[in-house]
Amino acid sequence: MHGFHDVFIQILLLLAISVSVIAIAKLLKEPDSIALVLVGLVLGLTELPIIEDAERYITQSEVFQATIISLFLPILLGDATLKLPFHHLFSQKKTVLGLAFVGTFVSSICIGTAAYFLLDLPLAVAFTFAALMSATDPISVLSIFKSLGVPQKMSTVMEGESLFNDGIAVVLFKIASIYLLTYMEMGWAGLGSGVFLFLKFAIGGALVGLVLGYFFSQVIRVFDDYPLEVAFSALLFFGSYFIAEHFHTSGVIAVVVGGFVFGDYGAKIGMSKETKTNINTFWDSVTLIANALIFLMVGLEIRNIDLAGNWGVIVGAILIVLVGRTIAVYLGTGWVQELSSKERLLINWGGLRGSLSVALALSLPMDFAGRDQVLLLTFSVVLFSLIVQGLTLKPLIKKLGMI
């Protein structure tokens, strides 16, 4: 108990550091996620006895890393669905659907195939890594867009793509990390089984989210009590996730669909303006803490990454992911006439990898063959994405004249 108390105090200290970094980043009008990663890198590279146990607990504890998925994902995804008005999403449906569905599959196939042949990774490892790299994280991008006054269209596209491709990427991640080798041995029958499993995950998760989203939308019609309605939203997010996972479908897709129903239909029939404001404020605060811990953890993980002798494969992985993203964007949106070449370029470079990729990588079982390789490449690409792409995004937007 005494040891847990010490670790808790140290994690609290890390949270205090995180919140302080966020406050300073906001004063400087810089993306707080990038600032957190940079501070995490500094903390990870220096040995400070006062937070050493907390660093070890965050980066090596199986319990903590399992908690990341079951606790943080419903929070991050649920909050995002509440923030994106459905009519905004519908107005950009062609671009969002092209990126989220065509783009995610193309990205996964390109990255997985290249990683297998060029990086000489085992098949399951290559496509597990590819699934992780197919999920985008718009947090840093949206904060930059907001600070510069980039048109709402681009924010809607980036956030809409992320919400849908996160669900697809998680399903692909599960198939690649658990079932891929078995299906490969089955030949064409395995391909059919893989497609069936994907549809089961996706459709089953969507149905769970639809039912629970509708149910809680009806429930909040009865009450005009925002603390209670906040509690109902939490029950929806976590309930959707765990019920879907219990029935071996996609918890991520369940949260996204349930959140959209609740945030759009539920808000129209059962939320006062005050309630909607307070629900958004509550989840803003919770999401800030969750993201702070995840992005700080990305930086802290540097002490567990063996860079020596791996620079070649790391650079190769970064290039493969960048090329895979480019192919995915142009194939996924090539038929969308409303999208300009400048907008495609911004979408391409703004497809950062972040918290979901990290959370999924850490959730891999310790006995997964190639876990260390996946962690090495995932954290390396995420660091490059957040720091290099993130810090060059603002100059790119100005260069393209999109403000």
Curated annotation (Swiss-Prot):
Effect of D137A: Lack of activity
Membrane-spanning parts: 7-27, 31-51, 66-86, 99-119, 125-145, 168-188, 196-216, 219-239, 242-262, 282-302, 311-331, 373-393
Domain of life of the source: Bacteria
Protein's GO biological process: regulation of intracellular pH; sodium ion import across plasma membrane
Membrane side Cytoplasmic: residue ranges: 1-6, 52-65, 120-124, 189-195, 240-241, 303-310, 394-403
Segments on the Extracellular face: 28-30, 87-98, 146-167, 217-218, 263-281, 332-372
Keywords: Antiport, Cell membrane, Ion transport, Membrane, Sodium, Sodium transport, Transmembrane, Transmembrane helix, Transport
Pfam families in the cross-refs: Na_H_Exchanger
Membrane topology reported for the UniProt record: Multi-pass membrane protein
Effect on the protein of changing D166E: Decreases activity. Increases Km for Na(+) and Li(+), and causes alkaline shift of pH profile
UniProt-annotated location(s): Cell membrane
pH-dependent activity: Optimum pH is 8.5-9.0 for sodium transport and 8.5 for lithium transport. Na(+)/H(+) antiporter activity is detected between pH 6.5 and 9.5, whereas Li(+)/H(+) antiporter activity is detected only above pH 7.5.
Major localisation: membrane
Annotated Gene Ontology cellular component terms: plasma membrane
GO molecular-function terms, A-Z: potassium:proton antiporter activity; sodium:proton antiporter activity
Family: Belongs to the monovalent cation:proton antiporter 1 (CPA1) transporter (TC 2.A.36) family.
UniProt cross-references to PANTHER family, sorted A to Z: NA(+)_H(+) ANTIPORTER NHAS2, SODIUM/HYDROGEN EXCHANGER
Protein function: Na(+)/H(+) antiporter that extrudes sodium in exchange for external protons. Can also transport lithium.
Protein name: Na(+)/H(+) antiporter NhaH
Organism expressing this protein natively: Halobacillus dabanensis
Lineage, opening ranks: Bacteria, Bacillati, Bacillota, Bacilli, Bacillales
